[in-house]
Amino acid sequence: MKVKKVVCAPGKTGFFFDDQKAIKAGAKNDGAFYIGTPLTPGFTQVRQAGESISVMFILENGAIAYGDCAAVQYSGAGGRDPLFLAKDFIPVIEKEIAPLYEGKEITSFREMADLVDKAISPSTGKIYHTAIRYGVTQACLDAVAKSQSKLMAQVVANEYGTEVSKKIIPIFSQSGDDRYLNADKMIMKCADVLPHALFNHVETKVGLKGEKIKEYVGWLRNRVLELRPCECYNPIFHIDVYGTLGIVFNNDFEA
């Protein structure tokens, strides 16, 4: 079976693009927004809607394989790829990547993924944006699965010499800034790993001595013990602090 055509469509992600540099420089929360001036190239606001690109492989039998190109919340920070805007990258996919697949046989996932993963963009001389590779390889996996009438997990297991898990894979839930109310929802639904909690600002969230994050972790522990649906529920706590503790304690690991 062959890939007849590659089609792209712009979309929105489930979360946001946040300018981490501006937030660390003091941009303040205002509801779901941040007030401040963007400091990272590409941003027009400190927080703006996350963007995605849906990549669709139209197959010979009429089936459609899907993949979603999406980037991380803090795009452009810490050496990451630049802000992923659909209007900038749909032309790249259509002009440079679609020809790698259109009219080609569907082979294996690894072989098809390598076409984009290991390719060098003729327009930049670099490998493609991580979001592009993430989404296009998803479409490759879905195409192989559909051509073989298998689940995507089965294709991965077969190609990498492993087995599909017989147990549920733990999923990490993220609260965003509403770290108290959303933690309650996670506890109610027995989330495996929680809550992320988005401690990305020293003064307002972490505390100048780390006291706010300490208070939150204590509250979270007690909340689980008080409200968990059963005693067998013992979730993993994952708190993301975005390097703020290094700022608070001046990178003193003994503090």
Regions found by a protein language model. Name each.
Residues 58, 64-148:
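Metal- or metallocofactor-binding catalytic centers and their adjacent structured scaffolds
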Residues 39-42, 51-53, 138-139, 152-158, ...:
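Short alpha-helical segments and helix-capping/turn motifs at coil-helix boundaries
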Residues 1-56:
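Short, Gly/Pro- and small/polar-rich lid/capping loops
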Residues 47-51, 135, 163-165, 231-233:
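Solvent-exposed loop and beta-edge segments used for protein-protein assembly and interaction
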Residues 171-255:
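Metal-dependent enolase-superfamily TIM-barrel catalytic cores that perform enediolate-based chemistry
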Residues 58, 141-144, 157-186:
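Glycine-rich, aromatic-flanked loop segments that form ligand/cofactor-binding clefts
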